[in-house]
Design a protein with these regions (language model features):
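C-terminal lid/capping helical subdomain adjacent to the catalytic/cofactor pocket in oxidative enzymes
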Residues: 122-180
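Active-site substrate-recognition segment that forms the wall
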Residues: 1-132
Length: 180
């Protein structure tokens, strides 16, 4: 057996709606921006008390955090990024100094990512009935990139063999009775 695996994150609900499939999915928005600093840390750091991750890049420090529950959209609230910046500032010398060539103390390259969330916090990893060859992988929340290899391996095996691995049992779509 062969199939298609839909791994569209927070957009899976929108993508499946024309097929008559409703998913209990919403988005938790995470904010990310670039901050230019004179001195960067040598490796990524998780600032656990403020729930912010920072990653050094050649162009500056990538700062990411928060979980905003405001719907499945890409509306960006600058005040959220500014709050993250205020929290992270206490950890870095020179946060408020301007990097040469920069004319801005505001967050640069600000964007929002939509993390797919299910009501019970578990992802949906299942065949999409009534379609024999359509499978879904979504709802990983903040762990999508982390869990992608294991999810891909498990669902690819399912799609190729047609046999649901016992490992995937807790992640069935039908656990949300009114949606499947």
């Amino acid at each position: 057996m062969k199939g298609v695996i839909l791994a569209g994150g927070a957009s899976c609900g929108t993508l499946l709606r024309p097929l008559g499939i409703r998913l209990p999915l919403t988005a938790g928005k995470g904010y990310s921006f670039l901050r230019r600093l004179r001195t960067l840390p040598r490796r990524p750091i998780h600032l656990g008390d403020i729930k912010v991750a920072v990653t050094p890049f050649a162009r500056g420090l990538r700062v990411a955090g928060t979980m905003e529950l405001s719907g499945n959209n890409e509306t960006l609230r600058r005040s959220r990024a500014q709050a993250i910046a205020r929290g992270a500032a206490q950890y870095f010398d020179g946060w408020d100094e301007l990097e040469p060539g920069s004319n801005c103390r505001e967050p640069e390259e600000l964007w929002v990512g939509r993390r797919p969330l299910t009501p019970d916090g578990l992802p949906i990893l299942d065949r999409v009935h009534p379609f024999e060859n359509l499978f879904i992988a979504t709802g990983h929340s903040m762990l999508g990139v982390t869990l992608a290899p294991a999810t891909g391996k498990a669902l690819a095996g399912y799609a190729l063999s047609g046999q649901r691995p016992e490992l995937l049992e807790p992640f069935r779509l039908r656990r949300f009775a009114s949606t499947s």
